[in-house]
Amino acid sequence: MQGESTIARRDFLTTALTAASSALTIGLSHTDAHGQEPTHQSYTTTKSPLSFDNLYDTSVLATTLKGEAADRLALRRLVDAWAHCADRRLAEAQSNLFVPNGTIFNYEGDPNTHQPHSTIKGRAAIRSALAVLNTFTVTLHMNGQSDAIIAGDHAIGETYCVVHQFSEQNGQRKCQTLGIRYYDTFLRQESRWYFAERKLVIDWSDSRISVP
């Protein structure tokens, strides 16, 4: 069972599937190139404002909020969009949450004491890696506490997430639960927030037989 758990954890690391966050913050390493806030507008759409298609919009224009409040809402939507797309198997939309050359670094242990286990760079590679989700019958990503520091078009944040992954093996349903943290670097382009870099950290995992 330990060997199977380790393999499953490494498979998960290789694909970096999750969202999320924590009240702890990390030092800001980027500065604003322009030092100005974008002009905000109210969100308009040809669809009904109550359409489910309008959920998880990461644009600061998709709200009547202004300034930092609009940025924080968009960043939280971005984190939640990753979880939503993972569970709904929307690989194209999920990979597009990154800038074109965005990178995921996967860790099995704290980044301060461990080297990345694997690295995934670019939207195409991220999209390809997401295919591992199809090996599970169902997944559930539950985002927890999250915080961010914003400086112009740049931001950083930490996110906590608990992931449940169900699979069928030898006629039995199995569940693997992962405790994950994300250290994110964000970039705002044309009023929309994207992931520039994600450090996925698996703190713990548990595998067991699941009885419906």
Give each language-model segment a name.
Residues Q2-A20:
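N-terminal secretory signal peptides and thylakoid transit peptides that target proteins
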Residues A91-C161:
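A solvent-exposed, acidic/Ser-Thr-rich amphipathic alpha-helical stretch
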Residues T14-A19, L28, Q36-T63, N134-P212:
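A beta-strand edge to alpha-helix "cap/lid" segment located at domain peripheries
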Residues S5, E68-D71, L75, D87, ...:
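Aromatic-acidic/polar surface patches that form glycan- and anion
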Residues M1-T6, G27, Q36:
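N-terminal acidic, proline/glycine-rich, low-complexity intrinsically disordered segments
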Residues H34-G35, A62, R72-L73, L78, ...:
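Extracellular/periplasmic carbohydrate-active domains that bind, remodel
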Residues Q36-R88, E92, N96, P100:
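Short, low-complexity N-terminal intrinsically disordered segments enriched in polar/charged residues
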